[in-house]
C-alpha cells in the first residue's frame, strides 16, 4: 500500500484469533509501519480456557498445567505477551469474550498493555440484549449453537453494535 501512495497512518490492520495476536505483535514491535490495528479474540495456542479449565482452577494453575504439558508453546506464548507488554504504546482496539474457549479467560493481560483499548464483548452470547446470529445466503444460526460461539462473536450480526466504536477508533488514528 505504501508503495502505491497510501500514507502509513491510513493503514489499519486487523486479525482474528492467531491473526489478532499477530496484529498486537506487529503494532508492538513496529508501531511506525501502520496507523493502528484491530484484534479479535487473539489466540494462537489452542483452546486454553476450556482445555485447562481456567474457570475452575484459575489462570495461574491453568497456565502452569499448560507449561508442564506443552513447555515450548507455553514459553513462546509468554515471551510474545511479554514483548507486547514492553511496548510504550500499542495502538490496538482489542475485542475479547470470556466464553471464548481459546483464551477468553486469559485475556486480562491486555489491560497491562499501554495504548490497547480492550472491549469485553459481553458476558453471554448477546450484545446489547440481542441474541447473536450468523447468516449465510440461505441459512442462519444462533451463535450460541455454533461449535465455538465465544470465539466467533465478532462474526455475528449483533456485533454490528460495535461498528460505531470501530469507526471512531479508525477516525482517531487518522488524525
Segments from the language model and where they lie:
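Structured segments of extracytoplasmic/periplasmic soluble domains
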Residues: 3-4, 14, 25-29, 40, ...
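Flexible, glycine-rich phosphate/dinucleotide-binding loops
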Residues: 20, 46, 101, 125-128
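C-terminal catalytic histidine-bearing segment of alpha/beta-hydrolase fold enzymes
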Residues: 116-175
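Extracytoplasmic/secreted envelope proteins and their assembly/folding machinery
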Residues: 23-24, 81, 163, 167
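The feature captures the conserved acid-bearing segment of alpha/beta-hydrolase catalytic domains
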Residues: 46-121
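Primarily recognizes the serine-hydrolase "nucleophile elbow" in alpha/beta-hydrolase
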Residues: 9-57
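Conserved acidic catalytic loop of the alpha/beta-hydrolase fold
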Residues: 1-9
Amino acid at each position: 500500500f505504501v508503495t502505491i501512495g497510501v500514507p502509513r497512518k491510513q493503514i489499519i490492520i486487523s486479525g482474528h484469533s492467531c491473526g489478532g495476536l499477530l496484529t498486537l505483535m506487529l503494532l508492538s514491535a513496529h508501531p511506525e509501519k501502520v496507523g493502528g490495528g484491530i484484534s479479535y479474540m487473539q489466540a494462537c495456542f489452542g483452546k486454553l480456557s476450556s482445555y485447562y479449565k481456567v474457570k475452575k482452577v484459575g489462570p495461574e494453575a491453568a497456565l502452569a498445567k499448560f507449561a508442564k504439558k506443552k513447555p515450548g508453546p507455553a514459553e513462546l506464548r509468554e515471551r510474545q505477551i511479554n514483548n507486547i507488554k514492553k511496548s510504550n504504546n500499542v495502538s490496538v482496539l482489542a475485542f475479547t469474550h470470556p466464553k471464548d474457549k481459546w483464551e477468553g479467560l486469559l485475556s486480562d493481560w491486555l489491560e497491562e498493555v499501554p495504548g490497547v483499548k480492550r472491549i469485553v464483548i459481553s458476558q453471554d452470547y448477546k450484545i446489547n440484549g440481542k441474541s447473536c446470529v450468523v447468516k449465510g445466503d440461505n441459512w442462519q444460526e444462533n451463535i450460541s449453537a455454533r461449535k465455538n460461539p465465544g470465539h466467533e462473536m465478532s462474526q455475528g450480526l449483533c456485533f454490528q453494535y460495535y461498528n460505531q466504536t470501530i469507526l471512531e477508533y479508525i477516525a482517531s488514528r487518522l488524525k
